[in-house]
Amino acid sequence: MTAEADTVIVGSGFAGLLLARALVAAGRSVLVLERGGLRSHAEQLRHGGHELEWRTATHSHEDGSRPYPWNYVFGVGGGSLHWTGAAPRLLPSDFTLRSDHGVGRDWPISYDDLEPFYVEAERLLRVAGDDLPLFPRSGPLPQPAHPPSPVDELAAEALEPFGALPQARPSVAVGGRPACCGNTNCALCPVDARMSMLHLLEDEHLLEHPRLELRTGVAVDRLRVGRGRVTALDCVDRRRRRSTVEASRVVLAAGGLENPAILLRSDLDGEHVGRWLFDHSHRLVHLELDRPAGSGRGATHITGASWAYADGPWRDRSGSQLVLPFNQGILGTRLVRDAIVAGDGRSRPLRERVERTLVFDVLGEDLPLPQRRIELSPRRDRLGLPRTRIHYPADSAYLEEARSRLVADLERRFARYGARVVAVERAGEGSHQLGTCFMGERDGVVDADLRHHRFENLFVVGGSAFPSYSAHHPTLTICALALRLGRDLVANS
């Protein structure tokens, strides 16, 4: 049988669609298979967003593992449909953690290898931010930084190096899309300013491209292999109807939980497939000051970032952390809860408490652990496919030590404001599913070019290919890896 396209891509998020764009631009034919549907931004607003998959039982937690709110979307656009737009690069030192500090893993590629693709990804995502010396660059960011908030200005004095957080929310209108409106609901932007892959489809008319076919409502059950190659994909649609897609080259771009699930269902369960799962630790740290902090104002919910805890000699024993001043201040749900507990007349006025509380959104790095893994469950999802069962034990001492050090140090740095830490609460975890098909020259699932170690025409792209993860949001690096893979596939075919 004849292959239906030069390349079959599984998944239509950041990685899948950026790769498809690169291939069709170079004259290659592409078939994209997407388990979910295509829902416009207007439809998302009407329905209040996309249904996150932790609500639809595609996975469960292993007995004894802590419940963890893994959230992801099946749908055209993938994670771009519900991300907040944060788009920093990794630091150069994030690629050499083991060489520099004797822990974790090095990447098989360097910052310099990825740098030109960072520039291209920033251009395509219309990233706004500062040109910070921490991140050597060969080209400027396409959009100026969002103006700093009062909280940023207060934090910058104590938390150098400090600058604007790079983010794919335009600070000025561009290409017919408005600037960020400051609504703070970035995951479902009310004016459609925050970049999504739907913008790429619309602006470049990709769905009308003669060399691109997008099939929605089609899940990949398993890969057929023979003689060191993938030969076909067995698929199932929403009505549980079966089909087979012949393939000359396959790229898995379905995310950190689905990529390994497809390999496991295909009995391609090498030593590392599905293991080394990681996500960022995410904490809101509340500091109460002796004066107003300026919370509740700013262009959007986060505009600045501190790299004071992002790198240093201590990374041999405690993880990197990215500290983001939270312009919103105390979340309304916490205020209501605490007011109910305290009772009327026994708590200070809420207005005073809000004004004097400085909140930091802190992303933390942990070391990859083999115990953190996904495997197949005997239970089935609504398409009849085995669910993934996730084992995600508690944070390691490497992360806990970093968190304790940061909390104590924040009080010291803000001592001039009479600061004391009054709360540290879990927030926003589960959106970054990384590491389950990591890249390595001799170990791992794929090599430095994202090619599977055993099958010459199988590639895995996205966060699942990360060998380690630092404290930085992964999206821009996912995009850069996809663009680099696109260059390589065009050059070698």
Named regions from a protein language model:
Residues 32, 214-215, 460-461:
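Short hydrophobic beta-strand that contains or immediately precedes a catalytic carboxylate
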Residues 179-189, 221-226, 356-364, 386-469, ...:
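A glycine-rich dinucleotide-binding beta-alpha-beta segment and adjacent secondary-structure elements
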Residues 13-14, 150, 257, 465:
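Residue-level detector of alpha-helix initiation sites
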Residues 100-219:
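Conserved redox-cofactor binding core of oxidoreductases
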Residues 51-134, 370:
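Redox-cofactor-proximal catalytic regions of oxidoreductases
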Residues 22, 248-361:
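Mid-to-C-terminal "cap/lid" subdomains and adjacent gly/pro-rich loops that border
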Residues 25, 29, 36-41, 223, ...:
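Glycine-rich loop(s) and the adjacent beta-strand/alpha-helix scaffold that form part
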Residues 7-32:
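N-terminal Rossmann-like FAD-binding beta1-loop-alpha1 element of flavoenzymes
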